[in-house]
Curated annotation (Swiss-Prot):
This is Probable disease resistance protein At1g62630. Residues 24-68 form a coiled coil. GO terms for biological process: defense response. It comes from the Eukaryota. Residues 136-440 form the NB-ARC domain. GO terms for cellular component: nucleus. PANTHER family: NB-ARC DOMAIN-CONTAINING PROTEIN (PTHR33463:SF210), NB-ARC DOMAIN-CONTAINING PROTEIN-RELATED (PTHR33463). Keywords: ATP-binding, Coiled coil, Leucine-rich repeat, Nucleotide-binding, Plant defense, Repeat. The lineage of its organism: Eukaryota, Viridiplantae, Streptophyta, Embryophyta, Tracheophyta.
Length: 893
């Protein structure tokens, strides 16, 4: 009988069954779960896409997505990536299954895969089941946030008030402010921004963006978005175009003020996504730039110039920076402080930096030394090289082209505060080959004026007129120091540019290494004798002439030049010896200047062209104007490449040989001359007349028969300035309709017999007309002779700016009917007792705040004026000003 026993199987079977139900289903139901996962994921994606389209519509209205919804989107994106991987491995995993999918060739792998499919299916179903009634909210923005501000610049209150008033005008959508670096533009813009912070003025948002040199559209968009509360992960996923659309849709329903600081180039508002404030009612754009060009390109045709401070205001700012303790430490310091402050020329940046530097200097010696450093080489002054000059250098670096940069550096050769004639600058640039003159002088001049315009618009030069009314520019002292610093390779090679202009030196300065000197300016000094030889192998420009300082003109005093002085200057291209009145001759050794292209001997005592000058074969520009002792120019025909010859005011006797010799100069393009009425050989020379840019006919003795000139026929389209003085002449004949297309300035003085000036009808570009002491003149434009012009549709004086009439006892008529005079700024009437009617009506003359004014000498004349109508009288009578001084032409001797 054997032993019997029993084992209970039910618990084991239950455990296996539970495992198969829970774990085995991962593999057994894999195919079914995969189908369900794929279907449910497609439904989830459809729901997500529907919500994203809704989101875009709401964000385009300026709403901001909820963080909760963004978390849901992120979870959908994460699970989608996982499911893509799972579905990619589907076929491989199904093929592993066996025994009716209850088993697998690799049980562990199939189990893990099946479990992952099951869990993802549950997650997708959960995500799909979430409901979003709201997915966005209003973006949270701060209307204005006050910006930190440097202490208000003394003296800018008036400018700030003007800017605020202009910006707040209903018609102002865009306002630009321009000026040189360091003048206070950013301070002014910040003050405007903070004024909006205090008084919102009905605006929803104020936005401040610093743009700087490299315009980065996306960077600007990001800064605006951050201000508007539109940033975040979703913002960074957009490209520039999408960001622009988003910003535009947000801002188009807002009243905003956008402040852009430090623009160097035009910024396309449309590309950024900013609605145009000129068409978006109630919106404003205010910006700063160093460039007038940028302001106009941004849409502000009349931007506000931020100028340097006036002298007294500048000194107030300087005193604040220095401090009363330092100013009161020695009785002599305040006077020296004013000298130092003046060196800053009203530039707030320089006043602040130099004022802070001097705030601890409490001895006379320290202040005197500061003045010495600023006068000799200002870049060495503490704070200049690290705080002032680099800031200004940004403007230099932003200039387009090396020729423009070189042109600016050239201006630093002139004295401080000098009024530099544009014409002189351009002549030097051409002969130094900064400007290409191969296509002719006039085209090169046009390039030069374009360069000057770009430098003015970049706030690196300022336009003005000199003492003789010539168009000129001034270089701010601090800009000049910056240019000298750059020219010296940032202070490394200080002797590259030797500039001692107008400082009273009596001899050539001492230089350690003459071989590195490229340009030297000793204008307006007290050097009497140029002696010795200097090895200036790289010297290209040597300026030894005059200089104009504000309202003062300083002449040079050179009397003699030694024979060896020019021996070692093989590259010298520009030599200016003008205004050395006691210089009567040049050494024959001037012929050693084998590269010389420009020679200025105007206002010197030169009597003739030396043999040495005749051997200057490369010379293209020779200036002999106002050489009152010049007896002949024999030998000038040897200067085969001469293109510009200036003889105005030279009193050169014009004989037949002189005319013939000049006619042999085949490359001559420009001629300026003074002739006497007898010089008929010159007047009959078509070659010389056609090249004349300035022609003066001057009778030397009013009682001499030599001054008789029965009639004059001038036919040249190059003539720009025309003067007739001290002559008896009955008529200036009219030529063809294109005779005087370039004529801009006409002066007639002390001429008998002349009854009318109808030839002027053929001068459409005439800007200045001065007629003084013409006893027989009856008409400016004679009615009968003008008929020919009127038949051609000509309206006289379309560009006339200045009209000066004096000592004309018989003058009755300027023109028989009113003229537009669109450019007319000033009429001056002296002794003209019979001139009772002016050719004006209520629409004539320059309009606006600086409209046409009338100066008159005799109050009886004004009482007798017959105005065209009451409207004309109302328009011009308030602008009439009584002037007692004699109205007469000023001309150079």
């Amino acid at each position: 009988m054997g032993i019997s026993f029993s084992i209970p199987f039910d618990p084991c079977v239950n455990k296996v069954s539970q495992w198969l139900d829970m774990k085995g289903s991962y593999t057994h139901n894999l195919e079914k779960n995969l189908v369900a996962l794929e279907t449910t994921m497609e439904e989830l994606k459809a729901k997500r896409d529907d919500l994203l389209r809704r989101l875009k519509r709401e964000e385009d209205r300026g709403l901001q997505r909820l963080s909760e919804f963004q978390v849901w989107l992120n979870r959908v994106a994460t699970v989608e990536d996982i499911i893509i991987t799972l579905l990619r491995d589907r076929d491989v995993e199904i093929q592993r299954l066996c025994l009716c999918r209850f088993c697998s060739k690799n049980l562990t792998t199939s189990y893990r895969y099946g479990k992952s499919v099951f869990l993802r299916l549950r997650e997708v179903e959960k995500l799909k089941g979430e409901v979003f009634g709201v997915i966005t909210e209003q973006a949270s923005t701060s209307a204005f946030e006050e910006r930190p501000l440097q202490p208000t610049i003394v003296g800018q209150k008036k400018m700030l008030d003007k800017a605020w008033k202009h910006l707040m005008e209903d018609g102002t959508g865009i306002m630009g402010m321009y000026g040189m670096g360091g003048v206070g533009k950013t301070t002014l813009l910040t003050q405007l921004f903070n004024m909006f912070n205090k008084d919102k003025c009905g605006f929803d948002i104020g936005i401040w963006v610093v743009v700087s040199q490299e315009v980065n559209v996306e960077k600007i968009q990001d800064e605006i978005a951050q201000k508007l509360g539109l940033g975040g992960h979703e913002w960074t996923q957009r490209d520039i175009s999408q960001k622009g659309v988003h910003l535009f849709n947000f801002l188009k329903n807002k009243k905003f003020v956008l402040f852009l600081d430090d623009l160097w180039d035009k910024v396309e508002l449309a590309n950024i996504g900013v609605p145009d404030p000129r068409t978006q009612k109630g919106c404003k754009l205010a910006f700063t730039s160093r460039s007038l060009n940028v302001c106009t390109s941004m849409g502000d045709e009349e931007p506000m110039e931020v100028q340097c401070l006036e002298e007294n205001v500048a000194f107030d700012l300087f005193q604040k920076k220095v401090g009363q303790k330092t100013l009161g430490s020695d009785p002599g310091i305040p006077q020296l402080a004013r000298i130092v402050a003046k060196k800053c020329c009203g530039l707030p940046l320089a006043l602040n930096v130099i004022g802070e530097t001097m705030s601890c200097k409490r001895t006379i010696q320290e202040w005197r030394n500061a003045i010495h450093v600023l006068n000799s080489y200002a870049a060495e002054f503490i704070g200049m090289e690290d705080k002032i000059l680099p800031l200004l250098k940004y403007s230099y670096d932003n200039l387009k082209g090396e020729h423009v940069k070189s042109s600016l550096l050239y201006c630093a050769l002139y004295p401080e505060d000098a009024k530099i004639r544009k014409e002189d600058l351009i002549e030097h640039w051409i002969c130094e080959e900064i400007i290409d003159g191969s296509e002719g002088i006039e085209k090169a001049e046009d390039k030069g004026y374009d360069i000057i315009g770009s430098l003015v618009r970049a706030s690196l030069l300022m336009e003005c007129v000199d003492l003789k009314g010539k168009s000129s520019v001034i270089m701010h002292d601090v800009v000049r120091e910056m240019a000298l610093w750059i020219a010296s390779e940032l202070g490394i090679q200080k002797e590259a540019f030797i500039v001692r202009a107008g400082v009273g030196v009596r001899e050539i300065p001492k230089v350690k290494n003459w071989n590195v000197v490229r340009r030297m300016s000793l204008m307006g000094n007290k050097i009497h004798h140029l002696v010795g030889s200097y090895e200036c192998m790289e010297l290209t420009t040597l300026l030894l002439g005059e200089g104009e300082y504000g309202s003062i003109w300083r002449w040079s005093e050179i009397k003699t030049i030694s024979s060896e002085f020019f021996n070692c200057m093989p590259k010298l291209a520009v030599l200016d010896l003008s205004h050395n009145q006691s210089l009567f001759e040049l050494p024959e050794e001037i012929s050693n200047l084998v590269s010389l292209k420009y020679l200025n001997l105007s206002h010197t005592g030169i009597r003739h062209l030396s043999k040495g000058i005749q051997e200057l074969k490369k010379i293209i520009h020779l200036n002999l104007e106002h050489t009152s002792k010049l007896e002949s120019i024999d030998g000038i025909s040897s200067l085969h490449n001469l293109k510009v010859l200036k003889l105005y005011g030279s009193r050169l006797p014009w004989d037949l040989n002189t005319v013939k010799e000049l006619e042999t100069l085949e490359h001559l393009e420009i001629l300026t001359t003074t002739i006497d009425p007898r010089a008929k050989q010159f007047l009959s020379s078509h070659r010389l007349m056609s090249r004349s840019r300035l022609l003066q006919i001057f009778g030397s003795n009013i009682f001499s028969p030599d001054r008789q000139l029965e009639s004059l026929s001038v036919s040249t389209d190059k003539l720009r300035e025309f003067e007739i003085m001290c002559c008896s002449i009955s008529e200036i004949k009219m030529g063809g309709i294109c005779n005087f297309l370039s004529l801009v300035d006409v002066t007639i003085y002390n001429c008998e017999g002349l009854r009318e000036l109808t030839f002027l009808i053929f001068a459409p570009k005439l800007r200045s007309l001065s007629v003084v002491d013409a006893k027989d003149l009856e008409d400016i434009i004679n009615e009968e002779k003008a008929c020919e012009g009127e038949d051609s549709g000509i309206v006289p004086f379309p560009e006339l700016k200045y009209l000066n009439l004096d000592d004309l006892p018989k003058l009755k008529n300027i023109y028989r009917r009113p003229l537009p005079f669109l450019c007319l700024e000033k009429i001056t009437i002296g002794e003209c007792p019979n001139l009772r009617k002016l050719p004006l009506d209520s629409r004539s003359g320059k309009q606006g705040e600086n409209g046409c004014i009338i100066h008159y000498k005799d109050s009886r004349w004004l009482k007798g004026v017959k105005w065209a109508d009451e409207a004309t009288k109302k328009r011009f009578l308030p602008s009439c000003e009584h002037r007692l001084e004699r109205c007469e032409t000023i001309f150079e001797d």
